[in-house]
Amino acid sequence: MNAVKTLRSDARRNRERLVASARELFAAHGVDVPVEEITHHAGLGMGTLYRHFPTKEELLDAVLEDAFAELVAAAEEAVAADDAWAGLIRFLERALAAHASNRGLKDVLAARGQGAQRAEAMRARIRPLLRRMIQRAQEQGTLRADFKPEDLPLVFWTADRVIDRTAAVAPDYWRRYLGFLLDGLRAEAATPLPRPPLTRAQLDRTA
């Protein structure tokens, strides 16, 4: 019995080491890190990896599960905030901070590389929350009325570009960009826009 318990404990520790190593490497280098590098970093063999995670997709799911859950929780908190504008700001700050600190998460949410299926499931869960977040801020008169849920991906696309270009020299520079962007989203600053938002079909074609 003790031998069985020891084996189970060893297996659990090995799984934790694999997930921890993958989390660190995905966050630093993105989801294209080879699994051989992950096992080497964990000090384990490929056989151990495949016993726990037969595919890289399964390993990525385990690594990013908590990150996805935190984004959904941030959206839920924003929707529940009494001040809808403050809730929207907090959500954007938390979401972009997650992008800035976790390149793997940013890759997956941008539909780059592995993990696209899990990312789409997360997006399907969070979309109704984002719509409600935007609706509440507009109902309170703090978010410009012509901002649509379909405009929100543009916020992340452009912010991710800032993150990519400045990460090595000023890791938090995206916060300055977000400040400029938020000023443009305030209802009192609104001026007519020259073009309508992308449709859902157009957004899907950009992925």
For the regions a protein language model found, what residue spans apply to each?
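Hydrophobic alpha-helical connector segments
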Residues: 62, 73-101, 114-118, 123-125, ...
